[in-house]
Amino acid sequence: MLNVLIGLHDTLQIRLEGGDGSVLFSMKGRGSSEIPNDKGNLCVQAAIRLIERTQRNDVNILIELDKRIPAGGGFGGGSSNAAAVLSAVHEALGQPLDEVELAKLALSIGADVPYFLRGASQVCVGGIGEQLHIDRSSSLRSTPVFLILGLPHLGTPVVFQEAGYSTRMENSVKKPTNSFPEEYGLLLSLIQNDLEIAASSLCGLLKETLAALRALNCGRVGMTGSGSGVFILPNDQTGFHIEDVEKLEEYCLSHALELVKSSII
């Protein structure tokens, strides 16, 4: 599996102060009213587990989150925020854990957290998220990408269950591919998402949207993560043609979806 970073992001403000090991969390922004603000939030989990692992009950961690990444879209918002909390708080505590210990802690929070903790863009991921190999090819760097937001929320465990997988996938662990082709067209031809069929069966609107966008032939259309977000890469790596952008804008406008332009970092 190839994971890449894009320009869409949330904003975190994190402070440490003397205390009793409490985690104080607040959130605003996109969809914040629908996202857990207790231990069900990966940011809170990351802070609590780091306090427990380092036995630092003499500090409180204050976290403020401004959401821009839609929840339940498969964009890794929760996992990337958890990784950011781990990294920032761990550094503020004087880096008491070594790299391996911190990576294990990250994996205990979520399968995608180690990837975001690593901080590299193009990474081939295998196992249950612990096998990471940086892909140093330039296949996708700086490539523009369109994101389709506004489709119904899909929970990762539900999609995995529909696909017949455990979310931990102990019985289907695969070694990561060490690299992907540098030729852009060949790379596009290899892009697929094994969870798309399951996610589409749970969300008819996702299935309809993917089919309609592919019929427009404006680029390579795929589903992000476990859904329900959709991405479109240009047929030509130099960028999207004006007529393709107009088609995408018209489709999203007529279907009450949000079209966001970003790029791969």
Language-model features: locations:
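ATP-binding N-lobe of GHMP and related small-molecule kinases
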Residues: 1-73, 91-100, 149
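Residue-level signal for inorganic ion chemistry
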Residues: 12-14, 43, 78, 147-148, ...
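Short, basic/glycine-rich phosphate-binding loops at helix/coil junctions
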Residues: 20-36, 85, 107, 183-192
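Generic structural signal for residues in well-ordered beta-strands
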Residues: 25, 61-65, 221, 254, ...
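Phosphate-handling active-site elements
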Residues: 52-62, 88-107, 236-251
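Contiguous, small/hydrophobic- and glycine-enriched helical/loop subdomains that border
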Residues: 59, 82, 86-131
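Glycine/serine-rich anion-binding loops at beta->alpha junctions
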Residues: 64-93, 111, 220-234
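Conserved, helical-rich catalytic subdomain that frames metal- and/or nucleotide-binding sites
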Residues: 116-118, 123-220, 235-265
